[in-house]
Amino acid sequence: SYNAYRILPTNLISAGDFIRVNDRTDAPTVADMGDIRVASFNVLNFFNDVVGGDANPSGSNRGALIEEEMVLQRTKIVNALVAMNADVVGLMEIANNGFGELSAIQNLVDALNAELTDDQAYRFVEIEDADKYEDKFIGSDAITVGMLYRPARITLDGAAKVIATPEQHAAEGAQTREKDGVVEQNPSYDKFQRHSLVQTFSINDEKLTIVVNHLKSKGSGCIEDWAEFNENGEPADLQGKCNSFRVSAAKVLGESLKDVEGDVLVIGDLNAYGKEDPVAVLTDYDASTTDHVIRTASWTTLNGKVYEREGSVIDKGYGLINLNTQAHGADTYSYSYNGELGNLDHALANESLAAKLVGIDDWHINSVESNLFEYGSKYTGELVKTESPFSASDHDPVIIALSYPAPVTPVTPTPEPVKDSDGGSLGYFALMLLGALGLRRRS
């Protein structure tokens, strides 16, 4: 063996030795339910740089590095979207390279519409020029959120809007911490999260406002993690790093949406599980009923101005309803991390929209699949990949079916004219004549 180690298996397995507990499905259970369907889908860094796509603000490519992989990634995403059959789709992790012919979102829509009939075709929502960063982008990150819709099924109501999310900027030495008598000053912190995209639609004279979100990840730390000596470890509450920063974003979202008229649906990758602070702030948190204190982040700015220097305590949530919890309880998931399943991708609604829920489904095409079957080949060698929706991303899409029945126009019945008798029965006038004749004979 020339001093090389080899593996000598002592037992062989076959396909029949595996126990399957999550059977694949060709489409979500709600794909044909309701009057309108909305989906949320994290598309795992869909970039089109390798086919001449426009640059994003950071100039970096987080997606496919060769054209073959990019085409495979796009094909898997398209096949998933076709099967979802949603009328509106919120996207996360799509390249933030504008809305032109060489943008990632145009590239995706072109490929998607090539598989559909005209009445099923999609367009993307574009923000107004005044809201674009550097006249082109949604915020300054390499990735962004996006929204697709079917104009044959749903109508735009006004222009799209951007909800800017907080940033955290703490200069070096702005804060101190102490442990075992040693006092330290913080390094500088500059943290960002994706802006949210808002679009109102008109459906049968009703308004539906959809908000697509992608909050700060749990991976990189914020100054609160440094202050608690967690910059290199897991925070004690197990909610991941930058939790207070995500709470700040949830507060901004809640404040921005609390007075919106009509139905409201908040979707996207919140990078927070269903019982964690950011979701609690958007839904049913009440400080008077618990000892758990929820705080926003410190050193935050919003639209370039100081937002919260010290952070603040949240007293009450914004009252949105977790549709997955309403329909299925806590037994839902859309993501797998270190073998543990949980729900990072949410659909939160106000009361009027929650009453319209027909069905909701996390379509498990990614979370329980091996990431070896994703588009990338860096670590998979000659492993055969397929164009199926399975392993199209690392997050499961969530699909929401809603009831928006078309109004029924009342029909006023047309009175039928009285028909002349042609035998078998006597009309009213004939009876009157007979009565008159009878009276005359008696006289």
What are the roles of these predicted feature ranges?
Residues 427-443:
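A cross-kingdom C-terminal cell-surface attachment/processing module
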Residues 419-429:
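Juxtamembrane/start-of-transmembrane alpha-helix segments at the extracytoplasmic/lumenal side
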Residues 6-408:
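Divalent cation-coordinating acidic motifs and surrounding scaffolds
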Residues 407-421:
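Ser/Thr/Gly/Pro-rich low-complexity, disordered linker/stalk segments of secreted
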